[in-house]
């Protein structure tokens, strides 16, 4: 009998995740594990979605970029006022499906009107941890103080096509625990997100160049270079759609992303979608 594909799916953090591919379960990249989710001493905002009109890889790179705060976010840097401002070296650690980093920033104090009297009152070192998991999960963990004042943010970025992305945003914190603070904190997060969007929507080229020699990467871009190298390794494994071939055939052929059952069963109605192959 003729068959159509179906895919493994599950719910986590209030988000439905579906694995689109034919890998067996023990070889897949699972959804990132948020260790503090539902843990004592932590509070999660309601998950929100953000639709952006640019490529998901560009979006992830922007979130990883340790240099952009000084130029894009007025509350995160000094807006060029410090002539000796510099980006400190990034400490990068490999993971099974990506990389983590640790970064020390020279950062201004937090706004007491927004974050209250417990917010840090002086400029100085601020530690940010983060990284990426798989091709499209961004992790940002901001520690404004040693034991508290922590914001942990997780962005699950769903590619719609080359030029559109839907982001599912999970925001965790271990301070300002009153439910009444949820709206204020998310409003602040969305202001920051739209500062990024205003810059990124005009970035050219829309899609990350195939070669890193086609854009200037500086020492501060080390984690971005690492992310691009990881994506290249995924491409070699056949994890990425060949968009050019797909577009050439889109009016003549309907394709399906292969499901796990294709490895053991036959008689599929639709051809498998074209994938990039190693050079």
Residue locations for each model-derived region?
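C-terminal catalytic domain of Rieske-type non-heme iron oxygenases
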Residues: 24-279
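Short, acidic, small-residue-rich periplasmic hinge/interaction motif at the N-terminus
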Residues: 12, 19-23, 29
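Tryptophan-centered motif/residue detector
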Residues: 17-19, 42
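Active-site-proximal cofactor/substrate-binding loop regions of enzyme domains
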Residues: 1-17
